[in-house]
Regions:
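Acidic, glycine-rich active-site loops and adjacent beta-strand->loop/helix elements
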Residues: 21-24, 71-78, 102-106, 137-139, ...
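Conserved thiamine diphosphate
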Residues: 62-65, 112-145, 196-206
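Generic beta-sheet signal
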Residues: 65-69, 96, 155-161
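Histidine/lysine/aspartate-rich catalytic loop segments that bind and position anionic ligands
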Residues: 94-114, 118-124
Length: 206
């Protein structure tokens, strides 16, 4: 939502109304009510299926655009994800990039405890994907992976991005309880202070 606001899809003030009753911006984005949203979310696993349709449409229409979809590693437990993966490889959708946020946690606990998905790289490879493994917090690695994906021909690409849930906020890092919890005022102030301190460090202001 923040990125869409910065790009001018709606006013920045809309961000202060997140998840308010009747507000434009809800927990699950709505393509019918929110500018800039290509696909509504809700049921896990649907994103990659929609992305496959968009990528196939580009091929059929001889368009050069590329399609990107982001999956959580808990979401990868859904069978629909693997049906879509099989479809993508079968149709040689080399204009499709699947990015998996691998933080090892989901709403019900750890991914491994709920339904283990490893070795995820081997699974995607066996389904016919080019696989790139990266540190999901390293922007240089992210950029390099996206550029490499553009060179892959004849098959889709899966970028497996290893991350830490709640990265940058000490009391949120790797804590499953923060999956859908809103911070109170004190927690919000501490979190923003920690994040600002990291920004200052990276920019050399401290």
């Amino acid at each position: 939502y923040a990125t869409l606001a910065l790009k001018g899809f709606f006013e920045w003030d809309e961000l202060t109304k997140l998840r308010h009753v009747g507000a434009m911006l809800q927990g699950h984005p709505d393509m019918k009510g929110t500018p800039g949203i290509d696909m509504s979310t809700g049921s896990l696993g649907q994103g990659i299926s929609a992305a496959c349709g968009m990528a196939l449409a580009a091929k059929l229409d001889n368009k050069s655009y590329r399609t990107y979809t982001v999956l959580g590693d808990g979401e990868v437990e859904e069978g629909q994800v693997w049906e879509a993966a099989m479809f993508a490889a079968h149709n040689k959708l080399d204009n499709l990039v699947v990015i998996v946020d691998q933080n090892g946690l989901q709403i019900d606990g750890t991914v491994e405890e709920v339904a283990g998905i490893e070795p995820l790289d081997k699974k995607f490879e066996s389904f016919g994907f080019e696989v790139i493994k990266i540190d999901g917090h390293d922007f240089n690695q992210i950029e390099s992976a996206l550029e490499k994906a553009k060179t892959v021909k004849g098959k889709p690409t899966a970028i497996l991005a290893k991350t830490i849930k709640g990265k940058g906020v000490s009391f949120m890092e790797n804590q499953v309880g923060w999956h859908g919890t809103a911070p109170n005022k004190e927690q919000y102030e501490q979190a923003t202070a920690e994040l600002q301190a990291e920004i200052d460090r990276l920019e050399g202001n401290c």
